[in-house]
Amino acid sequence: MGKDLVAASATPLVLAILAEGDSYGYAIIKRVAELSGGHLQWTDGMLYPVLHRLERQGHVAAKWSASENGRRRKYYRITREGRAQLAAQRQQWQAVDGTLRGIWMKACTA
């Protein structure tokens, strides 16, 4: 998958995953791979800049907490503002999807 498409889809993917429940970096990376059927293989270097930007924008909040094995992890949760942003992103992506489907149907039947 192209870098531009991966970058463009990062925000709605992270927000949608956090809308399922609080999570931490490694679990988010695994969830992206799972949801994409392995087509998207994110790294720490891809995810953490997105999380930090979303945190600065107030779309996610973070807190340190102990995991089951006692190690500290930074957990992220979506905020009210993040849910509003997710709804806006969803509308935008649905418009793009509808446009592409329409043009592809015409192109395939021409």
Pin down the residues of each PLM region.
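N-terminal helix-turn-helix DNA-binding core of bacterial DNA-binding proteins
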Residues: 2-46
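Short, contiguous hydrophobic alpha-helices characteristic of membrane insertion segments
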Residues: 3-4, 51, 110
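Basic amphipathic alpha-helical segments that dock to polyanions
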Residues: 47-54
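Beta-hairpin "wing" of winged helix-turn-helix
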Residues: 55-72, 77
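Accessory beta->alpha helical hairpin/"wing" motif in late/C-terminal subdomains of nucleic-acid enzymes
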Residues: 78-82
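Amphipathic alpha-helical dimerization/coiled-coil segments
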Residues: 84-110
